[in-house]
Amino acid sequence: MTTTSFISNVRARALSTTQKLDWLGPLVARITLGVLFVSTGWGKVHSLAKVTAYFSELGIPFPGIQAPMVSFIELIGGALLVIGLASRIAALPLMGSMAVAILTAQRENVHGLPDLFGLVEWTYFALLLWVALAGPGKISLDHVLFGRNRAENKSRSLGPEFSGKAV
């Protein structure tokens, strides 16, 4: 066996294995984010006075409205992510919450892209963007109730040059 054929064989086996496990990444990311947001939302719901005062200190407009709204967005959105129901929709307000957190609570800590990319809020935003665009994955209520997710659909809107198949 030549070195080239050995490498090709190893590559083919690795690709086959990773394709069989392609459901794991979205599941772990979605559940991790969901549990995190359920936890922070629950904490905020049960400490609304403190959250409202903190939002007021940050200069967030209408803190008496925003604090409960963000609390329930995190609690309900996180729960939806955990079970994989309406995941793409749930990710959007959570992304908004992370964007506001970056622009208010973390604003003074960001002096460039390395600082931004070092924020946990940015990591959550990026993972939520992935869920919003790629969907919740095969192990989700969305998949059970509505069938194939976007990642499994053929790229109808992008045309044949992006479908991965030769034209």
Which stretches of residues belong to each language-model region?
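Extended, low-polarity transmembrane helix blocks
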Residues: 1-46, 64-72, 76, 83-167
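Short juxtamembrane and helix-loop transition motifs at transmembrane-helix boundaries
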Residues: 48-60, 88
